[in-house]
Amino acid sequence: MRVLGVDPGLTRCGLGVVDGALGSRARLVEAGVVRTPAGAEVADRLRAVADGIDAWLDRTRPDAVAVEKVFSQANVRTVMGTAQAGAVAIMLAARRDLPVGLYTPSEVKAAVTGSGRADKAQVGFMVTRLLGLAEVPRPADAADALALALCHLWRGPALARLRAAAPAAPVSRPAPATPARRSPRPAAPARRPAGAS
């Protein structure tokens, strides 16, 4: 199986491709980044990210794509750019009918290092060991993308089997609204004729 990992970002979008199969060592195919200038319009930057990812999809022909899930950060502008670049990667994969795995940073760290609290240096070190590389891939965004690809290589097939085994949830439709019934008014007491006792 060949997986393209995408560490989304507007300034640097990390990309990493690995090959692997159950019981064999994963192999590096390619790693790098797509860069966009910080001063450019967001639309132009997203187009550059899309063009870069598209070129990688054409060149490396992955079987699946793994994208980092956006998590909450204090810097809203950073979160927005990351989310937008991630959405571009997901859309490009969907256009090619490629399965997409979404993983949080802690899921990726746990898959690669055994600890969801690992730092970037530990992730880079383990990616280097797992892929049998001579040095840590640079920049860190490329190493993170490779970690995403490795995470999907190991977890993706199991998650797909779980989804396939789970019974399909019935589609619930809202019940049609029924008009509220009014309870009948109690009848007014009969009036007695004047002078009746």
UniProtKB/Swiss-Prot annotation:
The active site is at D7, E68, D141. It catalyses: Endonucleolytic cleavage at a junction such as a reciprocal single-stranded crossover between two homologous DNA duplexes (Holliday junction). GO terms for cellular component: cytoplasm; Holliday junction resolvase complex. GO terms for biological process: DNA recombination; DNA repair. Residues 165-197 are annotated as: Disordered. Homodimer which binds Holliday junction (HJ) DNA. The HJ becomes 2-fold symmetrical on binding to RuvC with unstacked arms; it has a different conformation from HJ DNA in complex with RuvA. In the full resolvosome a probable DNA-RuvA(4)-RuvB(12)-RuvC(2) complex forms which resolves the HJ. The RuvA-RuvB-RuvC complex processes Holliday junction (HJ) DNA during genetic recombination and DNA repair. Endonuclease that resolves HJ intermediates. Cleaves cruciform DNA by making single-stranded nicks across the HJ at symmetrical positions within the homologous arms, yielding a 5'-phosphate and a 3'-hydroxyl group; requires a central core of homology in the junction. The consensus cleavage sequence is 5'-(A/T)TT(C/G)-3'. Cleavage occurs on the 3'-side of the TT dinucleotide at the point of strand exchange. This is Crossover junction endodeoxyribonuclease RuvC. It comes from Frankia alni (strain DSM 45986 / CECT 9034 / ACN14a).
